[in-house]
Each structure stands twice: as C-alpha cells, then as structure tokens.
Amino acid sequence: ARNGLSAVGLVSSAERAQFIATQGAAGSINRRDPRWSQAFTTVPTEASAIAEWQRAGEPILDEMRRQTGGRLADYVVSHAGQESFPRSFQLLAEHGTLTFYGATSGYWFSFVGKTGATTPEDMLRRARLRAGEAVLLYYGVGSRDLLDAVGLQAIEAVRAAGGRLVVATASDAQREFVQSLGFGDAVRGVVSIEEIRRKEGADFDWPEALPAMPDAKRETARFKEAVRQFQERTMKPFGGAIGRWLRSADNPRGYPDLIIERAGHDALATSTSLVKPFTGRVVYCESMQDRRYTFYAPQVWMRQRRILMPTATIAGTHLCNAYEVARMNDMIAAGQLEVSAPTVVPWEELPAAHQAMWDNTHAGANYVVNHALPRTGLRSRDELYQEWSALQGAAR
C-alpha cells in the first residue's frame, strides 16, 4: 500500500485478516474459509482431475476479482508451502510474476500452466541471453518423431544469439538426426536420454514428473532419502552428461546459464536443479495450458533461479547476495520499506521459540534471542556501554 499498490493478503485466520487490514491491505482471502478450504491442495496427475482442480479454484479467483475491481494479481509473494503455492500461481493475471522465499509446509511444488505461446527468439530476449552463455535445449519430447519444429527453431535462435548449446534428445535416433543437420560448432554436443539409460542401467531414472515427497517434518528421514534418490539417480547422471560439453574456466561444473524447457513434458524439477544458481533461467515458449508441472522448491528459492513462461514468471529469492541486500538497504533508507520490529525472546526461551517456528505458531516474522543485551531499544554502541556500566554500578 505504501508503494501505491493494492495488496490482498492470503491468510489463514480471521485474526490475521484483521491485522493486515490495519497495515493497509485492500482485502484478504482466508484459506480456511469453508467455501474453498478444501481447494488448497497440490495439483493432481490425471488430465480430467486437473480440469476439476482448476474449477475448484474459480471461487477463489472470483473473490479476488470482487476485492480488486475485476482484476487478478499482477504480483504474488508466496511462502506458505506446497498446498498454497498452486492456488497462488492460479491467482496470477496474464504476464504476472510470482516470487517466493520459503515454504512453511512442504517442498514439492506443483502448478498448472497458463495459456499463451511465443517464439524461442522472444523468450531468449526476455531472458537476456548473452553471447557465450551455456544453453541446454530439450528436443523431441513426448514423441519419437525425428522432426521437432519448435526444437529446430530454438536451435537457430540460440545460434543467432551466440549461445553455447547442448541438445538433449529423448532417443538415439533423434540425436543422430540433430547431428546430421550440420549445425557445426553452434551445437557443442547432443546427449540422448536413451543412451544415458543404457549406460547407467537401473541406476538411472528419468521420471515423468518429480515424484511426490514425504512430509519433511513428520517423515524427515524418508524425505531426505527421497531427495537423495532424485539427486543420485536423475541429477548426477544427466547433469554429468550435459556438463562435460559446457565446462569452461569460469564454469567448471558445466552448469547451463539457460535451459529451454518444453511444455510437452515435466522435467522442471531437473531443470531448476541443473541451471546455474543465482543467475540461471529456465524458459518455455510453448503453451503450457492445462498441464501440471512440478519442482523442488528449495532449488528455486534458495538458489534464486527464475522460470520464465510466455505469460507468467516464477522467481525465487533468498536475499543472499550483495546486490539484493544493498537494494533493500536503499529502500529502507528511502522510506519505501518499513522494517517490522522483531520478537525478542530471552535466552532461556530459545527452545520454545524454535518449537513455535517449527509448528508455524510463532507470533512474529523475525525472532531475536537476547543473550547479553541489558535492554531492548538501544541504538548505538555508546548506549550499550552506558547500560552495561549502569548495571555493573548497581551490582556493586
């Protein structure tokens, strides 16, 4: 509200709705409202179930439009976790951006793609591909056909932009076809998923989507094992096959700077784990309408990767680089951001504070444990020394 935006909060209680109203929110949508409380779920697998899932979210979209004069969200800021994320993405208006910085309940994220398509050239411009950057392209997904018109167009677009390209094909025959087209040095290498499977045998898995994961809080050991299996059986074999073609002096692991994803399959979990941390972009150019996509949330938010689609963007943020911290400090100094006072707890209450955060029952956004401060509200080192001196004098 302070920046001239109309903010609607997605909350979990009437009390939180009242609180954000006092902070200037234009409205709120309570996830626990009986009209749609059962709609906040992950996206199902089957196409017919996906259509029903989307219809179940229409009342939420209608409520958003009612509170905003008929509009959906241009921007969504999310951190609530795997059951709220899909509806948060559904609330996005055309060409909207969703950014998220955490997940309080589950890391297996899913969403339904939106309408709209564009050209590979347009998406490379949006992603600001620079000459010399490493690019991975999926070719021939969802088909055994040798000819992939969009894939060939994307190869030409990357070649024109000066990218260092590796192509991943579904089959050996597709690999041989791409190699026969005479792209020369424009295509550094062509990797067949079929060949990786043949070499690695039972140790390689190329899943149709990111497998559902156990609850990280209640089944921690099983959750960690599921993550490890995905890394060992999918990421390492595939990443190694791609990386050997893209390694350079400043990129020894061969991370792609940009990955051209395809709407016809769901390899988003692999792509968002493989693309370069902090600057990597995963882009789509085809229509993703009515299809489900899945990814492992920490790889996007903690590594600040971006997913660029024809009519939507997902951006992870973790406030862990110097540029973002400097920009935040500038905005605070200019009065554009107001820093909420932290909840201060004494040292002996640290276990209870940790438990409250784990259970998602904590009261404040930030907690500070007071180990040695004589009182709160001190603004300088001199004030701190004065308070310490006063305490020492009183002790005598």
Describe each model-derived feature in a short phrase.
Residues V345-P346, Y367-L373:
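Short-chain dehydrogenase/reductase
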Residues R66, A73-D74, P252-D257, A312-H318, ...:
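Glycine- and charged-residue-rich phosphate/anionic-cofactor binding loop of Rossmann-like
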Residues Q153-A157:
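Rossmann-fold NAD(P)-dependent oxidoreductase module
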Residues R2-E83, Y138, R159-D266:
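Adenosine-nucleotide cofactor-binding segment
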Residues S143, G151-L152:
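N-terminal Rossmann-fold NAD(P) dinucleotide-binding loop
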Residues D359-G364:
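Glycine/proline-rich active-site loop of Rossmann-fold NAD(P)-dependent oxidoreductases
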Residues L136-D145:
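Conserved N-terminal Rossmann-fold NAD(P)-binding element of oxidoreductases
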Residues N3, I20-A21, S37-V43, E83-E133, ...:
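Glycine-rich phosphate-binding loop and adjacent beta-alpha segment
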